[in-house]
């Protein structure tokens, strides 16, 4: 077994121009945490190397925060992973044009696999695919619809050359009930591509458990940070000393 460093991605979810957190990804469950740019700059100041930035309005198909999102990306000096509503060439190009280091494709990977294949061919590892899961069923369209069987889609995306997956247990997202480590192990058992974990982190011990899963390179942390369960410096300290196995 070897020591590994888990990359932490503090989340900034944007709805109607505000930084918010949802419970189980449901529209209408938002808790507001103020200005998205201020939140992103706080995470940068606290030591983040990545920020997970989500346009929830675009994800739910109810508009977008494109100008604000672009301002956040421009204003920080850390890498940004951008997600929400990226479903065609125009939205992909707009997301990449913000300067985001990486973009997450979700629904489109389920609904338009041919386009995703072409997008991966075109921009390579700047694309990660978000696999949002209930049990082993994928959730689409802002988590409001079923989108196919996890392992079938994963096999297809591996064959298409997808470089990275962001795996979210929808039932645990925003709930502070702990991550689904079994789900992460089941995914990393069938793909050699790196995985970023998302959903349910509530304590520093959860990050240690995630970091111990071989094949998981990062974890998105949202509500636990906003709710004060721990600080980002505390999280960075524990995830730089974990042994994988």
From Swiss-Prot:
What is a biological process (GO) this protein takes part in?
L-histidine biosynthetic process
Broad class of the protein's primary localization: cytoplasm
Q: Name one GO cellular component term.
A: cytoplasm
Residues of the active site = 13 (proton acceptor), 132 (proton donor)
Q: Identify the NCBIfam families for this entry.
A: hisA-trpF
Which class of enzymes does this protein belong to? isomerase
User: Which molecular function GO terms apply here?
Assistant: 1-(5-phosphoribosyl)-5-[(5-phosphoribosylamino)methylideneamino]imidazole-4-carboxamide isomerase activity; phosphoribosylanthranilate isomerase activity
- Among the Pfam families in the record, one is His_biosynth
Task: State which Enzyme Commission number(s) the record gives.
Answer: 5.3.1.16
The name on file for this protein is 1-(5-phosphoribosyl)-5-[(5-phosphoribosylamino)methylideneamino] imidazole-4-carboxamide isomerase
What organism does the record attribute this protein to? Frankia alni (strain DSM 45986 / CECT 9034 / ACN14a)
Cell location: Cytoplasm
Pathway given for this chain reads: Amino-acid biosynthesis; L-histidine biosynthesis; L-histidine from 5-phospho-alpha-D-ribose 1-diphosphate: step 4/9
What keywords are assigned to this protein?
Amino-acid biosynthesis, Cytoplasm, Histidine biosynthesis, Isomerase
**Organism classification, top ranks?**
Bacteria, Bacillati, Actinomycetota, Actinomycetes, Frankiales
| Homology family | Belongs to the HisA/HisF family.
Entry's PANTHER family? 1-(5-PHOSPHORIBOSYL)-5-[(5-PHOSPHORIBOSYLAMINO)METHYLIDENEAMINO] IMIDAZOLE-4-CARBOXAMIDE ISOMERASE (PTHR43090:SF2)
What this protein catalyses is:
1-(5-phospho-beta-D-ribosyl)-5-[(5-phospho-beta-D-ribosylamino)methylideneamino]imidazole-4-carboxamide = 5-[(5-phospho-1-deoxy-D-ribulos-1-ylimino)methylamino]-1-(5-phospho-beta-D-ribosyl)imidazole-4-carboxamide
């Amino acid at each position: 077994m070897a020591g590994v460093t888990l990359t932490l991605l503090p989340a900034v979810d944007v709805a109607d121009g505000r930084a918010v957190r949802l419970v189980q990804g449901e529209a209408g469950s938002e808790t507001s945490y103020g200005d998205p740019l201020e939140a992103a700059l706080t995470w940068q100041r606290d030591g983040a190397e990545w920020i997970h930035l989500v346009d929830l309005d675009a994800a739910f198909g109810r508009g977008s925060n494109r100008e604000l999102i672009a301002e956040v990306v421009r204003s920080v000096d850390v890498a940004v992973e951008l997600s929400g509503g990226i479903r065609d060439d125009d939205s992909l190009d707009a997301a990449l044009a913000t300067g985001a280091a990486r973009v997450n494709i979700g629904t489109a990977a389920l609904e338009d696999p041919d386009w995703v294949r072409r997008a991966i061919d075109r921009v390579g590892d700047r694309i990660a695919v978000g696999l949002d899961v209930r049990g082993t069923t994928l959730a689409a369209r802002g988590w409001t619809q079923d989108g196919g069987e996890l392992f079938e889609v994963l096999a297809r995306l591996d064959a298409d050359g997808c470089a990275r997956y962001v795996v979210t247990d929808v039932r645990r997202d925003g709930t502070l009930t702990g991550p689904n480590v079994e789900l992460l192990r089941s995914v990393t058992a069938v793909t050699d591509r790196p995985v970023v974990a998302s959903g349910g982190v509530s304590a520093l011990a959860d990050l240690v458990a995630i970091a111990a899963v071989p094949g998981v390179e990062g974890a998105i942390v949202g509500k636990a940070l906003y709710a004060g369960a721990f600080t980002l410096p505390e999280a960075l300290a524990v995830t730089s000393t974990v042994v994988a196995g």
